[in-house]
């Protein structure tokens, strides 16, 4: 919710609440705080029965004062959200071992991020601690197993199924090595994200005018166009009647995972929200559809 008319955004939030959707996730970086401002306006302090989560992403300039940067980011987020606390506060950085912008190593998270998060929890500003699981898979596994986090946002979709199932070594996307199961075995709540692969699973290369103008490839190691081309390989399942559209197929694929407790879907309009809810209400895909999907995914391997 970074673009569009305020009245339309308010209607989308109201519709979501009226229809049993109770998890609202945002981040300081979404629209440079605009998403938080819009969500705060729509909620107007009324969080009865819902979970609000936000995230902090540290830049290289923040690394000299990680604890202070985290605290300042959360305080600014709470001001924009018009709240005195959030249910879940999440780290929004890539884990790795380079000096790339926005990348943290495992030791920085353990030694500096987690203590800062714990202090904010003790102060009553957050209830639960989480992180976005992107980056080095070994580090992500260690992080969900470290005992300090309550939740992890995990990439999982038709193009990137590895968080939920074993894929070949040469599968052309990140291999998260069944991170969903690892998280749940460690007592960490798994939240499925990037369900539509940043929009690629719409099958349309043209970005929605209210969405992000561009995204990095999620389902391939090449570019967004390649992601879209791979997404179109699932169109025969639509033609065969397994789902009414590619987005519906993508959403129902994710909720077909029997152990994934929560799925998060990014939306730009009320219409997209209603379509996503309708897809969820249709339930998991049939076993035959899932078998056809596995065959298509296997063909992605070079």
Where do the protein language model's features map onto the residues?
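Beta/alpha (TIM)-barrel catalytic core signal, keyed to glycine-rich beta->alpha loops juxtaposed to Asp/Glu
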Residues: 94-301
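Alpha-helix-loop-beta-strand connector modules within alpha/beta enzyme cores
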Residues: 36-54, 110-123
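A structural motif
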Residues: 18-21, 83-86, 126, 149, ...
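Active-site mouth loops of central-metabolism enzymes
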Residues: 1-7, 56-68
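A short, structured active-site edge motif that brings together acidic residues
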Residues: 49-61, 91, 158-159
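Active-site groove signature of glycoside hydrolases
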Residues: 78-103
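N-terminal binding-site loop/beta-alpha segment at the start of enzyme catalytic domains
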Residues: 1-51
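Acidic (Asp/Glu)-rich catalytic clusters
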Residues: 17-18, 40-48, 78-83, 144-147, ...
């Amino acid at each position: 919710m970074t673009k569009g008319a305020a009245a339309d955004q308010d209607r989308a939030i109201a519709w979501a609440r009226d229809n049993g959707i109770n998890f609202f996730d945002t981040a300081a970086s979404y629209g440079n705080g605009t998403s938080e401002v819009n969500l705060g306006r729509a909620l107007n302090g009324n969080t009865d029965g819902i979970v609000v989560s936000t995230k902090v992403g540290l830049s290289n300039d923040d690394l000299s004062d990680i604890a202070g940067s985290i605290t300042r980011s959360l305080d600014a987020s709470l001001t924009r959200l018009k709240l005195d606390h959030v249910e879940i506060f999440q780290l929004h950085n890539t884990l790795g071992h380079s000096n790339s912008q926005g990348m943290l190593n495992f030791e920085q998270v353990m030694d500096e991020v987690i203590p800062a998060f714990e202090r904010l929890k003790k102060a009553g500003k957050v209830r639960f601690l989480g992180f976005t699981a992107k980056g080095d898979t070994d580090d992500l596994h260690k992080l969900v197993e470290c005992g300090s986090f309550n939740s992890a946002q995990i990439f999982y979709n038709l193009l990137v199924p590895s968080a939920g199932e074993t894929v070949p070594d040469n599968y052309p996307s990140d291999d998260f090595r069944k991170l969903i199961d690892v998280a749940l075995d460690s007592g960490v709540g798994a939240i499925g994200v990037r369900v539509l692969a940043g929009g690629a699973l719409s099958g349309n290369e043209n970005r929605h005018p209210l969405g992000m103008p561009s995204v990095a490839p999620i389902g391939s190691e090449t570019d967004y166009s390649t992601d879209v081309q791979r997404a179109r390989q699932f169109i025969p399942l639509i033609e065969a009647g397994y789902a009414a559209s590619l987005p519906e197929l993508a959403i129902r694929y994710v909720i077909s995972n029997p152990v994934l407790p929560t799925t998060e879907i990014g939306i730009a309009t009320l219409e997209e929200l209603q379509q996503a809810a309708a897809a969820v209400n249709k339930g998991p895909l049939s076993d035959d559809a899932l078998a056809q999907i596995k065959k298509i995914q296997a063909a992605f391997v070079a």
